[in-house]
Amino acid sequence: MEDINRLLQIRKTVLQMLSDREYIITAYEQEYPRESFVSRENLTMYCVKKDDPTDSIYVFFPDTPKVGVTQIKKYVDIMKDRQANRAIIVVQQNITPFAKQALAEFSQEKKITLEQFNEAELLVNITHHQLVPKHILLTKEEKLELLTRYKMKESQLPRIQTNDPVARYYGLSRGHVVKIVRPSETAGRYITYRLCV
């Protein structure tokens, strides 16, 4: 019973993450009935981006504690069928070393992005913590405007790592720029920008 509560909390965090990444969340996904939970595989979700219907994402919840290459291949096939270009795999423990290698290979070969999160990472939405400032992903146009306004090169911006927890939450990849808004006692708010590397 407690496991169901834990899974539904993780699912809630994933829905918030997808919403923050500007994916459309259906009413059914939001109001997922507790009674319809049978297995982790039932929690699988498919969403499309608000402004770009060709940009879609899958969220997989594997039943097995350790995820192997065969399961990764199965997920990639499912993605191909629906022409999804991104996926999040929420694992119970870890994925095998061969599966990690397969994730990297599929990402390079097939031009798809496979992200892996442990369940423990998604129990709490880190962006709701009071010490985590608001992060806003800039569009390409906003990024260009920022660089021209301050007459600077991309390499001169402060950096944020791709493996940073907030960068992973927002699905940032190399070259993305985020606007970070922090509260400030003197100025009201302090804005900074970071380049994902």
Curated annotation (Swiss-Prot):
GO cellular component: RNA polymerase I complex; RNA polymerase II, core complex; RNA polymerase III complex
Annotated compartments: Nucleus
Gene3D superfamilies linked to this entry: RNA polymerase, Rpb5, N-terminal domain, RPB5-like RNA polymerase subunit
GO biological-process terms attached to the record: transcription by RNA polymerase I; transcription by RNA polymerase II; transcription by RNA polymerase III; transcription elongation by RNA polymerase I; tRNA transcription by RNA polymerase III
Record keywords: DNA-directed RNA polymerase, Nucleus, Transcription
UniProt keyword annotation of Nucleus present: yes
GO MF annotation list: DNA binding; DNA-directed RNA polymerase activity
InterPro entries the record matches: Arch_Rpo5/euc_Rpb5, RNA_pol_Rpb5_N, RNA_pol_Rpb5_N_sf, RNA_pol_subH/Rpb5_C, RNA_pol_subH/Rpb5_CS, RPB5-like_sf
Keyword Ribosomal protein among UniProt keywords: no
Coiled coil: none
Subunit text: Component of the RNA polymerase I (Pol I), RNA polymerase II (Pol II) and RNA polymerase III (Pol III) complexes consisting of at least 13, 12 and 17 subunits, respectively. In RNA Pol II, this subunit is present in 2-fold molar excess over the other subunits.
Family statement: Belongs to the archaeal Rpo5/eukaryotic RPB5 RNA polymerase subunit family.
Function: DNA-dependent RNA polymerase catalyzes the transcription of DNA into RNA using the four ribonucleoside triphosphates as substrates. Common component of RNA polymerases I, II and III which synthesize ribosomal RNA precursors, mRNA precursors and many functional non-coding RNAs, and small RNAs, such as 5S rRNA and tRNAs, respectively. Pol II is the central component of the basal RNA polymerase II transcription machinery. Pols are composed of mobile elements that move relative to each other.
Database matches in HAMAP family: RNApol_Rpo5_RPB5
NCBIfam families found in the cross-reference section: PRK09570.1 (NF007129)
Protein name as it appears in the record: DNA-directed RNA polymerases I, II, and III subunit rpabc1
Organism of derivation: Dictyostelium discoideum (Social amoeba)
